[in-house]
Amino acid sequence: MGNACRGSFGGKTFQGYPQPQDHSESNSNPKHNSDSPKPKKEQQPLVTMNRTSTNQSYYVLGHKTPNIRDLYTLGRKLGQGQFGTTYLCTELSSGIDYACKSIAKRKLISKEDVEDVRREIQIMHHLAGHKNIVSIKGAYEDPLYVHIVMELCGGGELFDRIIQRGHYTERKAADLTKIIVGVVEACHSLGVMHRDLKPENFLLVNKDDDFSLKAIDFGLSVFFKPGQIFTDVVGSPYYVAPEVLLKHYGPEADVWTAGVILYILLSGVPPFWAETQQGIFDAVLKGHIDFDSDPWPLLSESAKDLIRKMLCMRPSERLTAHEVLCHPWICENGVAPDRALDPAVLSRLKHFSAMNKLKKMALRVIAESLSEEEIAGLKEMFKAMDTDNSGAITFDELKAGLRKYGSTLKDIEIRELMDAADVDNSGTIDYGEFIAATIHLNKLDREEHLMAAFQYFDKDGSGYITVDELQQACADHNITDVFFEDIIREVDQDNDGRIDYGEFVAMMQKGNPCIGRRTMRNSLNFSMRDAPGAH
């Protein structure tokens, strides 16, 4: 089955679980014998909201969109969820197949429901570009539905693969866990908490490749600031962390959930289970992990050590996603990397600093044309770094932010990044400069963005960008100290002294021309875990 939308909007916030009573040993610590239940698909939400009919003429997305049927043909049903249905769809212009999740607006009763849909789309845009996260193609709205068009994953669910196999070898389980926790690390580094990780929410692109995994379904995901505490109880019973049940949690809950998935990968059964939902919650709150039943006596101590550290009852003592990836059981050849990878925004900033002025201005133009849902995540990150709420990031704020995210950059390197992003040489990075420097470069694959940017520079509509037009654009952006002829010469492939659309597109889409230099997109890819000024 393809990109099913089961549960995307199913596990809604509710009033919470009753505090646990005395737990019987039979409920909280059962042995995983031959009668132990296999993990079940979480088909039901933790609570069902009461819904009534309402007028659906409003815009859920907040703006008018093209008619999806002018761009795609909708085909057979791939999956069914509480709020909508996923269909196979084909792009008319290219013939490429995608998945389309159509969400019924009549089921979006409350303001919170509408915000959930918007936020899911925002988060998918924000996480765009990660190889193990399903990519969003676009969002559309008509009077009855919101349609989310995304990458098609036709290889089926990881859950079904687990059921077929029973359980995995340690090496294969380690490789799969590396992918799953890699997704968690990517989410956390961009200030996103998933909140509903489970095997059903990982699809295979290719049914013959166990490792072609893509995370789907960000319907319960939220943006978070470091230190922020969440109290709404969401998720799926088998996988929910104890602190979620106690209504006091943060992104550490995602690591717990990944630990539950790892336990299932190795044993074929969940670590916490009972005959009733409340019994499962009681078992989670007790936190006893069974390593005595088969196959655990035959598995390595290193695997058990990692599970204990991921299923640690105290969130503050639980491993972070990056620490999980550095654990000897996960690492290639049992050797952890000697340094942390650049967080997402940091790597984006590094890439940006290597671009010429024309490309930076073009990215600013593209950034200004992006929809609110495409940049909502970056807006949250900007606010977290702008600790004095001045509307601009100073050198000290950038330096403090990067230090908080574990960066070891020297002051001179941070200054280089600052200067690269500060296109107008004001001494600070304003909101527009930040967005331009940190938008994911997959935006450059979209023809409408490239054409709009080219037309911005081509003031007279001649089909060429001339030196005079480039000079005018720089003046409009308060950019000085630019050698216009040098920019033209760098981009002009046929040496006619001007830039045509093909040359412009080639410049925008080519890789970093200055390998080794720091770029702004690369440097603001920091982890939101310790965002400065966030509360």
Swiss-Prot record:
Listed name of the protein: Calcium-dependent protein kinase 5
GO cellular component, one term: plasma membrane
Reaction equations catalysed: L-seryl-[protein] + ATP = O-phospho-L-seryl-[protein] + ADP + H(+); L-threonyl-[protein] + ATP = O-phospho-L-threonyl-[protein] + ADP + H(+)
Residues that hold ATP according to the record: 78-86, 101
Family matches, as SUPFAM superfamilies: EF-hand (SSF47473), Protein kinase-like (PK-like) (SSF56112)
BP-aspect Gene Ontology terms: intracellular signal transduction
Residues involved in Ca(2+) 2 binding: 422, 424, 426, 428, 433
Classification via InterPro entries: CDPK_Ser/Thr_kinases (IPR050205), EF-hand-dom_pair (IPR011992), EF_Hand_1_Ca_BS (IPR018247), EF_hand_dom (IPR002048), Kinase-like_dom_sf (IPR011009), Prot_kinase_dom (IPR000719), Protein_kinase_ATP_BS (IPR017441), Ser/Thr_kinase_AS (IPR008271)
Binding site for Ca(2+) 3: 458, 460, 462, 464, 469
Sites where the protein binds Ca(2+) 1: 386, 388, 390, 397
Annotated region described as Autoinhibitory domain, given as residue ranges: 336-366
Lipidation (N-myristoyl glycine): 2
Lipidation (S-palmitoyl cysteine): 5
